[in-house]
A protein has these predicted regions:
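Acidic, glycine-rich two-metal-ion catalytic cores of nucleic acid-processing enzymes
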Residues: 1-101, 203-311, 325-332
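Core structural elements
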Residues: 89, 110-126, 240, 317
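Polymerase palm active-site segment centered on the conserved acidic dipeptide of motif C
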Residues: 189-213, 319-359
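Catalytic palm active-site di-aspartate
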Residues: 57-58, 124-130, 139, 147-148, ...
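Short, solvent-exposed polar/charged micro-motifs at secondary-structure junctions
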Residues: 21-22, 63-64, 315-317, 353-359
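Extended, well-ordered alpha-helical scaffold/bundle regions in very large, multi-domain proteins
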Residues: 117-214
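Alpha-helical scaffolds flanking conserved acidic
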Residues: 103-114, 302-303
Length: 359
């Protein structure tokens, strides 16, 4: 009984996700990923007497990995300069020079959502729908006429948008409580953001296209192909760790309008596969390798007691806290031999309470 013994086991499934990430164990009543920052539950998790919890989080690891794999030098320059990629994209997107997290928090959050989702070929309808429910844990957001005008959307654009049957069908699939006109404005603003991302991120678009071609060339036909640290083979993609992401029984099927769509078996269901999804899988899998390498280095000195997303948690003697913070930082941003030149960044902090470890 946890209440009596005091220790909290954190049940994780190794390679629980298809990309290799850890997941909460099936049947577990504890999922650390669901503990919100500042919550009482998060703050109730404590290090043993005389110790602290050191938490280190790899910042924006997925956009950094994607930038390297796609040779997106413009984004890499932002990272190398220590800049804020979300604010930089937001400034470009909304034409607000010098914007930052404090001056324009809503616009920056929109840019963050776009950068994280659009990088994996997210379409405007999915982006619009996810914004309405809260993209990646952010507060729900619906773009207004003011936002649309800032993005260059005109009344004529709205009328033209509503005259296309395909757009109406996509809109009807989006759960909403606003009027159809308001939803159309929101969708057009979302589309403008997606379009601007793609126009400004041609290396990423080219990488999607490469991954799309490799679905047939390598994953289906079995012709081996290596791109940087990733190797494509018959129904599998080999990560830098040597582990494989698998796509069993991959085959072409007919989609809407006779278009060829690729699907693979996932248990009893078929799952679609396309360039953007392959990109997502590769980036998440490679980011997991970078994270795991850092964890293995840290574990040589301090015991790890958990990992949440791109964060590790170690137990450290209280008197070593400051030195441990510096040391953990160094282990997490150490050079990555299979991603030469990737500019890593990490935030590290400590406290006896987990919820206060990073401020």
């Amino acid at each position: 009984d946890i209440a009596h013994r005091g220790r909290l086991p954190v049940p994780l499934s190794y390679f629980g996700a298809g990309t290799g990430r850890w997941t909460a164990s099936k049947g577990s009543a504890i999922n650390m990923q669901n503990l919100k920052r500042g919550s009482f539950l998060r703050n109730s998790i404590m290090a043993p007497q005389g110790h602290v919890l050191v938490a280190g989080d790899l910042s924006q690891i997925e956009p950094r990995v994607l930038a390297v794999l796609s040779d997106n030098e413009a984004l890499l320059d932002v990272f190398r300069a220590g800049g804020d990629p979300y604010a930089a994209f937001g400034a470009q997107m909304f034409n607000i020079p010098g914007m930052n997290k404090d001056s324009h928090p809503v616009e920056r959050q929109s840019a963050k959502s776009a950068l994280l989702g659009a990088g994996y070929q997210l379409g405007w309808a999915s982006f619009a729908a996810q914004l309405l429910t809260g993209f990646l844990g952010a507060a729900p957001l619906r773009y207004t006429i003011k936002d649309a005008k800032t993005l260059g959307v005109t009344a004529a654009d709205v009328d033209r948008f509503l005259s296309w049957e395909d757009n109406i069908k996509r809109m009807e699939s989006i759960p909403h409580t606003c009027t159809n006109k308001e939803l159309a404005i929101h969708c057009l603003a979302a589309k403008a953001i997606i379009d601007r991302y793609r126009a400004a991120s041609q290396p990423v678009v080219a990488f999607w296209n490469l991954c799309q071609e490799l679905i047939e060339y390598s994953l289906y036909k079995g012709k081996e192909y290596t791109h940087k640290c990733i190797t494509f083979r018959k129904e599998q993609i080999i990560l830098p760790s040597g582990m494989a992401m698998r796509y069993p029984d991959l085959r072409p099927d007919k989609g809407d309008g006779g278009k060829v769509v690729w699907t693979y078996a996932d248990g009893n269901k078929r799952v679609s596969l396309y360039g953007g999804k392959v990109t997502n899988n590769i980036v998440q899998g490679t980011a997991r390798c970078v994270m795991t390498d850092g964890m293995l280095r840290v574990a040589k000195k301090y015991p790890l007691v958990g990992t949440v997303h791109d964060e590790l948690i170690a137990v450290v003697p209280e008197e070593e806290a400051e030195d441990a913070k510096t040391w953990v930082f160094a282990q997490m941003v150490a050079p990555v031999p299979y991603l030469p030149g990737i500019p890593l960044k990490t935030d590290v902090g400590y406290n006896r309470r987990y919820g206060l470890a990073k401020g």
